[in-house]
Amino acid sequence: MENPPLESEIKEDMSLKNHPPDKDKDKDTIMEQPSSPRHRKVVARWLPDEAQRPIINDAPVFTPSLEEFVDPLAYIEKIRPLAEPYGICRIIPPSTWKPPCRLKEKSIWEQTKFPTRIQTVDLLQNREPMKKKPKSRKRKRRRNSRMGSSKRRSGSSPAESTSSPEAEEKFGFNSGSDFTLDEFEKYALHFKDSYFEKKDSGGDIVKWTPSVDDIEGEYWRIVEQPTDEVEVYYGADLENGVLGSGFYKRAEKFTGSDMEQYTLSGWNLNNLPRLPGSVLSFEDCDISGVLVPWLYVGMCFSSFCWHVEDHHLYSLNYHHFGEPKVWYGVPGSNATALEKAMRKHLPDLFEEQPDLLHGLVTQFSPSILKDEGVQAYRVVQNSGEYVLTFPRAYHAGFNCGFNCAEAVNVAPVDWLAHGQNAVELYSKETRKTSLSHDKLLLGAAYEAVKALWELSASEGKENTTNLRWKSFCGKNGTLTNAIQARLQMEEGRITALGRDSSSLKKMEKDFDSNCERECFSCFYDLHLSASGCKCSPEEYACLKHADDLCSCDVKDGFILLRYTMDELSSLVRALEGESDDLKIWASKVLGIEHSDEDQTKTSSVISEEKKLKEGSFDLNIDLEMDYQEDVKEEASTSGGELTASENLGVSVEPINLGFLIFGKLWCNKYAIFPKGFRSRVKFYNVLDPTRMSNYISEVLDAGLMGPLFRVTLEESPDESFFNVSAQQCWEMVMRRVKDTSTSLGLPILPQFESINGLQMFGFLSPSIVQAIEALDPNHRLVEYWNHKNQTSSDSKDHFISSNCSASLTKGKLFGVDLM
């Protein structure tokens, strides 16, 4: 049995020996075995003559210009043809990109603790299966131990990191001490200095710094040809609630006028996953490690083992500070070859655990991969640089010393085909999914339909977002092909079941809104379709396992379809640009019902009516003087509870009245909607709800569908919201403000649930109403005038108040003074 080290030895070798005792630290270390790295002397040393540095080619390095750096997704799309064949690449930002790291705040650096894992580096590749491993071996090897360890992204549940006997038997999941960053840095420096210690002929220690090549050669010597045990700590997979992000977020308080370029940037990993054009923006939940970044605090030799990202997503890693990280990447085209090579050389480990690579605890030399014909490439990531990995690209690596990095996933539209392959593979492996792939796929299709419709509408705005979505559509477009492939897959599986058409039923819209629906057999996501039986109303199967659900008669079974095959075929045609199908799907996406009868009626009405253009109405009819008074009048006469818009004391500034189109769609009982109407109003910024910003509300011509309402954040024109309803248009803005507030951890007042779209446009401001009414002296917009003549002003005021369900008190919201 190994003798525990003397207390004096521990004090002598700890990097914190010159600091006063920390009671919390003592509590942390008590949880570990006396022989853990933090308690032991660093006795092992560098063996340069036995270095095993892999000789492989470097992956490409990209240096975007300031202009290219503005849009991360556009830049990734630009470099993809050059970088994807390597599976990995390095991106060096412009020299002006120097985001401050919030982790260096004294309260975080010195006071906030984070958990670590112990990683036994010498067993990452060459180890015996747990069942064959002699129980005494661990103690025996510790006598000549070196120090080193932890692990990389596991995706494991907290239960897998417990100290239960079962967890202890699982390789790579031993919990280490809790450290502050200050403590961890000192410990990491002490370990590295001791390990690479050099002495001159007189026995004096020579100060020197090992190169990346020196460290790399020693690392692979330890992994491939170990002589002693080497353990290190690794603060891996640190969730947002532990240390938080290294980037400042929009809601956080900070000093300096240039901070907005960092808090709002897409290269800020808190913003990246949900950028317009990333399919992950259609995922409602904040999935830790996927949509919410994880931190990694490393020391020399701490490792992240070979793995691919969940759902074969892209990943982006930013190196906040510290010493370099060395990466190795294998392109997705070589993924199967890597798996085959590792199975060949590590047969016992794979026999015991067929899904070994899912555990992220197995390292494997790039030199052996190269010998097996697997393409592998190297990246050295320095502080302030990004590393991008591509779909299904295996990657691994280690740290050269104390450092901190942060990573998150992203899913450009080209990922969809890879994501589909991933969920089919997961189904075969009976592996649970993290995302609903079909929900993301349909979300992308809906967004593309909206973009195509907005671009096709009269005066459609060709903003960056809409044009980007358009580029994925058309015949053989990336998104079109993804929907087409999914349609063909569904058709084939329904046909293979051979069920009667009477068994096909419409899936309820909220089928999976409140709970995850997955196949009882293979865990396949059931957002698009599901098979069920009367005998088990709460259990469902995917179409591949429908016949395995139960032994009941086929007639008792049913198939739920979110969309029929005809509807999905129509969606494909809509994305290809077929106008009739685009109208149908625009109707669905924009939230109104559409039928052939309605279309016929609308066509006949529009074909008979004349468009009367009164020109740009002179807005000097006391509008500038009146519109602020209108707010007071509306608030005093509406009665009832206040909407958000009324509570804010909305001041709508008219910009252009536009001109009238005389058709029944261009008015309703309560307002007239002139084509070209534009107004300005202040409301909470959808990107930063802590401040108020101007929005431009306008009315466009959507052809047969009548007016199309658009609201745009004036300072950020790409932030536009379209709908065929003024009310729903502003509700979209409200929802976005709430979503952003939630993601930034800002409070959401429970009564802040309602907004009056007509009021936000200005269609309830008396002076604006009067000016619009003057455009129709002959009362040709019959529905509006009939209602106005038949009802009293009190009735109209009652309508306004009846649409308001929220009551707000004036004061501050998110720290902003209400107007």
From Swiss-Prot:
Compartments, record wording: Nucleus
Any one of the GO CC terms: nucleus
Cofactor: Fe(2+)
Ranges for domain FYR N-terminal: 644-702
Pfam families: FYRC, FYRN, JmjC, JmjN, zf-C5HC2
InterPro entries referenced in this protein's UniProt entry, alphabetically: FYrich_C (IPR003889), FYrich_N (IPR003888), JmjC_dom (IPR003347), JmjN (IPR003349), Znf_C5HC2 (IPR004198)
Primary residence: nucleus
Cofactor comment text: Binds 1 Fe(2+) ion per subunit.
EC number: 1.14.11.-
PROSITE patterns assigned: FYRC, FYRN, JMJC, JMJN
Sequence ranges of Basic and acidic residues compositional bias: 8-30
Effect of gene knockout: Weak late-flowering phenotype.
Zinc finger (C5HC2): 519-571
Catalytic activity: N(6),N(6),N(6)-trimethyl-L-lysyl(4)-[histone H3] + 2-oxoglutarate + O2 = N(6),N(6)-dimethyl-L-lysyl(4)-[histone H3] + formaldehyde + succinate + CO2; N(6),N(6)-dimethyl-L-lysyl(4)-[histone H3] + 2-oxoglutarate + O2 = N(6)-methyl-L-lysyl(4)-[histone H3] + formaldehyde + succinate + CO2
Record domain JmjC: where: 261-427
Biased segments, Low complexity type: 155-165
Signal peptide range in chain numbering: none
Chain residue ranges for the region called Disordered: 1-39, 120-171
Keywords: Chromatin regulator, Dioxygenase, Iron, Metal-binding, Nucleus, Oxidoreductase, Transcription, Transcription regulation, Zinc, Zinc-finger
Domain named JmjN: residues: 59-100
Family recorded in the similarity comment: Belongs to the JARID1 histone demethylase family.
Miscellaneous section: Plants over-expressing JMJ18 show an early-flowering phenotype.
Protein name as it appears in the record: Lysine-specific demethylase JMJ18
Organism of this sequence: Arabidopsis thaliana
Taxonomic lineage from the root: Eukaryota, Viridiplantae, Streptophyta, Embryophyta, Tracheophyta
Gene that this sequence comes from: JMJ18
